[in-house]
Amino acid sequence: MNPQRKKRLLLIVGLLVGVGVAVGFALSALQQNINLFYTPTQIANGEAPLDTRIRAGGMVEKGSVQRSADSLDVRFVVTDFNKSVPITYRGILPDLFREGQGIVALGKLNADGVVVADEVLAKHDEKYMPPEVTKALKESGQAAAGGETKP
């Protein structure tokens, strides 16, 4: 093999290794930022991973919101009308958060089956509902409060 061909081969191999490492880092970073959506039924059935950031969504059960008197801690229950999951959150809830409305909570599921949320998203208006929540409610055979939903 002549020296010029050997040099080219080493350059190509070096570039391929560099691209491979870059793709590996990119995939690793993307995997850490993925938040999969789980319904209350999936969470109650043990399909959601523990201590991994997930999105849990459904309708806030009426009468389930409990606010702490001396802190910003809130505990409420989310349902897809098949099963329910308790969620705890520390912070100020969105203005549109209320019982009987659709929400999506981002957080981690603990060993007690409680989603410890660090972010709560409420629906935008009376007709809008997050697509994941709409799909989960349709699969459970229930309609959202207030009639039809628009994804």
UniProtKB/Swiss-Prot annotation:
GO CC aspect terms: plasma membrane
InterPro entries cross-referenced by the UniProt entry: CcmE (IPR004329), CcmE-like_sf (IPR036127), NA-bd_OB-fold (IPR012340)
Cytoplasmic side, ranges: 1-8
Keyword Membrane attributed: yes
Keywords: Cell inner membrane, Cell membrane, Cytochrome c-type biogenesis, Heme, Iron, Membrane, Metal-binding, Signal-anchor, Transmembrane, Transmembrane helix
Pfam families: CcmE (PF03100)
Keyword Cell membrane: yes
Transmembrane segments: 9-29
Role of this protein: Heme chaperone required for the biogenesis of c-type cytochromes. Transiently binds heme delivered by CcmC and transfers the heme to apo-cytochromes in a process facilitated by CcmF and CcmH.
This protein's name: Cytochrome c-type biogenesis protein CcmE
Source organism of the structure: Pseudomonas putida (strain ATCC 47054 / DSM 6125 / CFBP 8728 / NCIMB 11950 / KT2440)
Highest classification ranks of the organism: Bacteria, Pseudomonadati, Pseudomonadota, Gammaproteobacteria, Pseudomonadales
